[in-house]
Amino acid sequence: MAAGVAGWGVEAEEFEDAPDVEPLEPTLSNIIEQRSLKWIFVGGKGGVGKTTCSCSLAVQLSKGRESVLIISTDPAHNISDAFDQKFSKVPTKVKGYDNLFAMEIDPSLGVAELPDEFFEEDNMLSMGKKMMQEAMSAFPGIDEAMSYAEVMRLVKGMNFSVVVFDTAPTGHTLRLLNFPTIVERGLGRLMQIKNQISPFISQMCNMLGLGDMNADQLASKLEETLPVIRSVSEQFKDPEQTTFICVCIAEFLSLYETERLIQELAKCKIDTHNIIVNQLVFPDPEKPCKMCEARHKIQAKYLDQMEDLYEDFHIVKLPLLPHEVRGADKVNTFSALLLEPYKPPSTQ
C-alpha cells in the first residue's frame, strides 16, 4: 500500500497488523540463539521441575557453545540426581560431554549454622560464637552474599561461554540476584563496627573460609572484591548478557508465585521473557482417564490465564511424564522438548 495515513507518513498496513499480535514461539530457541548471554537463571516455586529444566537447557546450550557450566545454588542439590552423577563445589565434567560442567554450592551455610559441639572445648570460643553471630546479624546476608561473590569471582576467571544457575526456591533466588547490594551495604556496616568486633574477627574469618586476618584486612579484602561484584551486577542488569527463566506448573499457587517472582525481577531490573509450564497432563483419547481429564481441565484454565497475562513471553509447555528424568541420556531426550513443542497423543 503506497499511501501514508493522514499525512503522518506511516504505512496503513502497520496499523492493520497491530491489533493481532502473534503469540511468541513456545520454545527456548530464543535463548539458545542469543549467543551474547553469559548468565541464565532458572527458578520458581519448589517442586515444579526447575532442576530438570535447567539441566535440559544446559545440555542444549552445550551443543552450540564452547563451554557451559551449570551451578546449583539449591541446598537440595538435585543436579546430582538429574545427571545421576555426584558433583561438588568444583566444576566437574558431566559424563558423556566434553564441554558441559556442573558444580553445587550451598551459600546459605554461615556462622549461625555451625554446631554448638564445635565450640565445646573452650568457654571463650563458645562466647566467641555468640559474638560472631551478633556481629553477622548487624549486616544480614553478608556471609551468603560473600559466598556468591567468591563463586562469581572463580567462575569469571574460568571463562565459561555461558553459566546456567539452577536456583533454590524464590527467596534464595532473589538474594542471589541482590548479593552485590548486600555486600556493599555489609562493607559499610563492617567499617562502622569493626573496632567492636576486632577481638573475634579472626575466628569469624576462619568460619567464612577467608583465612586468618584482622578487621582491617577483612575490609580490604571486601573492597578488592567489590569491582568484580559491581561488574557482575552490571551484567545481571544487561538483557544482552543475563536472563531469567521462570518454571511453574498450571496451578493457582504456582501462577501466583510466578507473578510475584516476575514483579521482583522487574524491580531488580533482571530481564525475563520465558516461562516454562511443566507437568502438563494430556489425556490419551484411546485410554480414557477421568482423573487425567479433570486435571487437564484445571490446567487448561490456568494456561489460558497465563497466555493472556504473559502474551509478551515465550511460554513453553512440557508434559507430565510416566517416568523420572534421571541420567544424562534421559535429560538429553527431554531437552529436545525445549526446542520442539510437545505433541500430545490426540494430535499425533
Curated annotation (Swiss-Prot):
One cellular component (GO) term of this entry: endoplasmic reticulum membrane
Primary location group: cytoplasm
N-acetylalanine: residues carrying this PTM: 2
Active site: 74
Phenotype when the gene is knocked out: Causes early embryonic lethality.
Catalytically driven reaction(s): ATP + H2O = ADP + phosphate + H(+)
Localization, UniProt: Cytoplasm; Endoplasmic reticulum; Nucleus, Nucleolus
Keywords of this entry: Acetylation, ATP-binding, Cytoplasm, Endoplasmic reticulum, Hydrolase, Metal-binding, Nucleotide-binding, Nucleus, Transport, Zinc
EC number: 3.6.4.-
Top-level lineage group: Eukaryota
GO biological process: post-translational protein targeting to endoplasmic reticulum membrane; tail-anchored membrane protein insertion into ER membrane
Binding site for ATP: 45-46, 49-52, 251, 278, 319, 321
Uppermost EC category: hydrolase
Pfam families per UniProt: ArsA_ATPase
SUPFAM superfamilies to which the protein is assigned, alphabetical: P-loop containing nucleoside triphosphate hydrolases (SSF52540)
Keyword Glycoprotein attached: no
Binding site for Zn(2+): 289, 292
GO molecular function: ATP binding; ATP hydrolysis activity; membrane insertase activity; metal ion binding
Task performed by this protein: ATPase required for the post-translational delivery of tail-anchored (TA) proteins to the endoplasmic reticulum. Recognizes and selectively binds the transmembrane domain of TA proteins in the cytosol. This complex then targets to the endoplasmic reticulum by membrane-bound receptors GET1/WRB and CAMLG/GET2, where the tail-anchored protein is released for insertion. This process is regulated by ATP binding and hydrolysis. ATP binding drives the homodimer towards the closed dimer state, facilitating recognition of newly synthesized TA membrane proteins.
Family: Belongs to the arsA ATPase family.
Protein's name in the database: ATPase GET3
